[in-house]
Amino acid sequence: MSGEGKKHGSNVEPLRPTRPCPECGRPSVRERYPFCSERCRNVDLNRWLSGSYAIPVADDESKADDEDR
C-alpha cells in the first residue's frame, strides 16, 4: 500500500506549461521561468539595465494644452 502512494505522488502536473525562452528559444524551466537558464535570465536583465529595452510612453496632448494656458 505504501508503494502506491509514492507512485501516485511522483506524477505531479506542472503549474504552467513550458514556453520557449525569449532569449534562445529552448524550453523554459520552472526555476527560471520564463527563461531556460540563469545565463538567458542575466542577458535579459542586462538589456533592461543598459537601456536596450524601453517602454514607449505616449504624451497626453490634452494635458500639454492645459499647461500652456
Curated annotation (Swiss-Prot):
Annotated segments matching region Disordered: 1-28
Annotated residues for binding of Zn(2+): 21, 24, 36, 40
Pfam family, one: YacG
Biological processes per GO annotation: regulation of DNA-templated transcription
Keyword entries, A-Z: Metal-binding, Zinc
GO MF annotation list: DNA topoisomerase type II (double strand cut, ATP-hydrolyzing) inhibitor activity; zinc ion binding
InterPro entries noted in UniProt: DNA_gyrase_inhibitor_YacG, Znf_NHR/GATA
NCBIfam families: PRK01343.1
PANTHER family referenced in this protein's UniProt entry, alphabetically: DNA GYRASE INHIBITOR YACG (PTHR36150:SF1)
Functional note: Inhibits all the catalytic activities of DNA gyrase by preventing its interaction with DNA. Acts by binding directly to the C-terminal domain of GyrB, which probably disrupts DNA binding by the gyrase.
Protein name, as recorded: DNA gyrase inhibitor YacG
